[in-house]
């Protein structure tokens, strides 16, 4: 990631809720933590998460495969695993393109 690109943090989102919605800082932080907790719990249970107009968090199972050590060239088995991917919605993609 490039150093000159800013990052939106939990604290930033909490501050936005405080200023724009009028919630207290404590309530804003609690709301963010609860929302992220619900998303995390759903993903832990193996559920995909779809937020309309934003995107989807999708769990994918990767099968075992053979990889190669780039330094030695020796083949190495890569264990099966579950990965989390994010796919932005079409609306989000359009908003990003228009904003660029």
UniProtKB/Swiss-Prot annotation:
Pfam families: Bac_DNA_binding (PF00216). Gene3D superfamilies: IHF-like DNA-binding proteins. GO terms for biological process: DNA recombination; positive regulation of metabolic process; regulation of DNA-templated transcription; regulation of translation. GO terms for molecular function: DNA binding; structural constituent of chromatin. One of its GO terms (cellular component) is cytosol. InterPro entries: Hist_DNA-bd, Histone-like_DNA-bd_CS, IHF-like_DNA-bd_dom_sf, IHF_alpha. Signal peptide: none annotated. The keyword Zinc does not apply. The keyword DNA-binding applies. Keywords: DNA recombination, DNA-binding, Transcription, Transcription regulation, Translation regulation. SMART domains: BHL (SM00411). Heterodimer of an alpha and a beta chain. NCBIfam families: himA (TIGR00987), PRK00285.1 (NF001401). This protein is one of the two subunits of integration host factor, a specific DNA-binding protein that functions in genetic recombination as well as in transcriptional and translational control. Belongs to the bacterial histone-like protein family. This is Integration host factor subunit alpha. The lineage of its organism: Bacteria, Pseudomonadati, Pseudomonadota, Alphaproteobacteria, Sphingomonadales.
């Amino acid at each position: 990631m490039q150093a000159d690109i800013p990052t939106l943090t939990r604290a930033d989102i909490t501050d936005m809720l405080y200023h724009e919605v009028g919630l207290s800082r404590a309530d804003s932080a609690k709301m963010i933590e609860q929302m992220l907790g619900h998303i995390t719990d759903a993903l832990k249970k193996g559920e995909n998460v779809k937020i309309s107009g934003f995107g989807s968090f999708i769990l994918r199972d990767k099968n075992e495969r053979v990889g190669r050590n780039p330094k030695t060239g020796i083949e190495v088995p890569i264990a099966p695993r579950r990965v989390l991917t994010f796919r932005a919605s079409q609306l989000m993609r359009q908003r990003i393109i228009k904003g660029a």
